[in-house]
């Protein structure tokens, strides 16, 4: 009892401190002498994102165009279309990512690709001219694809290319594009029995073309013939034009990729012995000038075109009207 009383009295006894010795700290003492250091994270600013992060996010979206889900691919294409970049160098990667989707099995994905391609061409003028080699390769492949749905939507992409880069198509891919129309419409270029049976076999193996799809194909064929066989008329504007010296073009960089093609140094552009182009010689011909394209149509394609278009006119309806319009273009070409 006396021991406990002594321990309680110790709590009220004032300790005698020696000189220079600090007071003992209690057991529950918390040290507050430290100073916090600030942490700076400039790349994680909420107010404004850095351009590098934006570009990384955009490239990540482009990688999702290869996603296994068609719904994801469609939504990614919509997102890219709604926020196209201002940096022109990124459009090459956009085309490299979306053009393989021309062969996509989903119709909704192909429609989004067409919409995005149209928007890219409108945003960056000259984009399709610059990348015409890779773009037209996928379009021609789609026009001869084994799946009917992909063939049916292929001319939508060709229509976009013709709207923005018809001159590039006419100069470098006139013959291949025109032959692709014969493939997609199951037309025959020759009248011999062997070619006719081959055309019938090919048509049955790849499946027939629906009436709605044929209307679209003929409409694009009409645009193709008009844009490649006739000179474009200059649009009249009210903006004053400054006079340019007529010799200026001789000192400027050429606008076409083959400025010396007219000299026929590396191509065979001369007709055969009978002064007629043949189907076998089309692959080695250059179609840079308008007269060569017109002569190719006159010598090789005009007769089978008229024959097949006349058969479609007899069907009537929208197909007949579009076919008649194409025949009108051939008549204009014949009279010019």
UniProtKB/Swiss-Prot annotation:
What keywords is this UniProt entry annotated with? Nucleus, Ribosome biogenesis, rRNA processing
- Tell me the compartments it is located in: Nucleus
MF-aspect GO terms: chromatin binding
Note the InterPro entries from the entry: ARM-like (IPR011989), ARM-type_fold (IPR016024), Ipi1_N (IPR024679)
Q: Which domain of life is it from?
A: Eukaryota
Predominant location: nucleus
* Gene Ontology terms: biological process: maturation of LSU-rRNA from tricistronic rRNA transcript (SSU-rRNA, 5.8S rRNA, LSU-rRNA); pre-replicative complex assembly involved in nuclear cell cycle DNA replication; regulation of DNA-templated DNA replication initiation; ribosomal large subunit assembly
Can you list the GO cellular component terms from the UniProt entry? cytosol; nucleoplasm; rixosome complex
Quaternary state and interactors: Component of the RIX1 complex, composed of IPI1, RIX1/IPI2 and IPI3 in a 1:2:2 stoichiometry. The complex interacts (via RIX1) with MDN1 (via its hexameric AAA ATPase ring) and the pre-60S ribosome particles.
Q: Which family does it belong to?
A: Belongs to the IPI1/TEX10 family.
Q: Per its record, how is this protein called by name?
A: Pre-rRNA-processing protein IPI1
Q: Which gene encodes it?
A: IPI1
């Amino acid at each position: 009892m006396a021991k406990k009383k002594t321990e309680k009295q110790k709590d009220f006894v004032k300790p005698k401190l020696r000189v220079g010795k600090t007071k003992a700290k209690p057991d529950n003492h918390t040290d507050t002498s430290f100073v916090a250091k600030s942490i700076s994270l400039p790349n994680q600013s909420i107010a404004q994102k850095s351009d590098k992060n934006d570009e990384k996010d955009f490239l990540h979206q482009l990688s999702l165009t290869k996603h296994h889900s068609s719904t994801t691919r469609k939504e990614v294409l919509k997102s890219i279309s709604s926020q196209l970049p201002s940096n022109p160098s990124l459009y090459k990667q956009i085309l490299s990512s979306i053009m393989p989707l021309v062969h996509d099995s989903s119709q909704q994905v192909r429609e989004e690709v067409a919409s995005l391609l149209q928007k890219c061409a409108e945003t960056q003028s000259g984009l399709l001219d610059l990348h015409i080699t890779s773009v037209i390769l996928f379009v021609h492949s789609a026009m001869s694809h084994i799946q009917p749905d992909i063939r049916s939507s292929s001319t939508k992409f060709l229509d976009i290319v013709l709207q923005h880069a018809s001159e590039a198509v006419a100069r470098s891919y006139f013959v291949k594009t025109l032959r692709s129309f014969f493939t997609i419409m199951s037309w025959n270029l020759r009248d011999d029995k062997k070619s006719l049976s081959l055309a019938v076999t090919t048509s049955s193996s790849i499946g027939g073309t629906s009436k709605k799809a044929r209307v679209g194909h003929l409409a694009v064929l009409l645009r193709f013939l008009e844009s490649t066989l006739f000179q474009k008329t200059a649009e009249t504007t009210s903006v004053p034009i400054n006079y340019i010296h007529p010799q200026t073009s001789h000192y400027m960089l050429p606008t076409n990729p083959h400025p010396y093609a007219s000299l026929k140094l590396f191509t065979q552009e001369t007709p055969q012995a009978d002064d007629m182009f043949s189907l076998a010689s089309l692959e080695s011909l250059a179609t840079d000038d308008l007269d060569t394209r017109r002569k190719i149509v006159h010598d090789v394609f005009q007769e089978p075109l008229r024959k097949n278009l006349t058969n479609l006119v007899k069907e009537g309806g929208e197909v007949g009207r579009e076919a008649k319009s194409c025949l009108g273009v051939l008549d204009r070409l014949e009279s010019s």
